């Protein structure tokens, strides 16, 4: 099964928001009123973006909490598909939509 290219929420936060806006992790954590370790762990890839963090990021950057949660959700799903790809291929699909579950088809939504 082909591996998916997976854009990480941490990479988007770092490269698309913090670097261009010249915002440090420290400044972001202070402005969001959260521990600095939370942002640091997200940037390192050791922590997921929670609903709480998503709401705070959306208020700060002027986008929606769903933007951040969907980034995290898509990342998590793609990781699981890649991790379970061999198992998924062995599962026989029941019903009319044979082999709907694949990297190619799941990535379309």
List each language-model region with its residue ranges.
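Short, charged recognition helix plus adjacent turn
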Residues: 69-109
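A short, Lys/Arg-rich alpha-helix, primarily the initiator
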Residues: 1-23, 107-109
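Short alpha-helical DNA-recognition segment
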Residues: 22-41
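Short, basic-rich loop-to-helix N-cap that marks the start of a DNA-contacting helix
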Residues: 46-59
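The alpha-helix within a helix-turn-helix
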Residues: 18, 29, 58
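The DNA-recognition helices of helix-turn-helix-type DNA-binding domains
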Residues: 35, 46, 61, 72-75
């Amino acid at each position: 099964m082909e591996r998916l290219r997976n854009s990480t929420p941490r990479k988007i936060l770092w490269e698309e928001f913090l670097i261009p806006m010249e915002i440090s992790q420290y400044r972001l954590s202070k402005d969001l009123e959260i521990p600095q370790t939370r942002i640091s762990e997200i940037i390192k890839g050791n922590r997921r973006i929670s609903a709480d963090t998503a709401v705070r990021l959306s208020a700060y950057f002027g986008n929606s909490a769903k933007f951040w949660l969907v980034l995290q959700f898509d990342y998590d799903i793609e990781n699981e598909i890649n991790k379970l790809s061999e198992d998924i291929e062995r599962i026989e699909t029941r019903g009319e939509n044979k082999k709907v579950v694949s990297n190619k088809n799941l990535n379309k939504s």
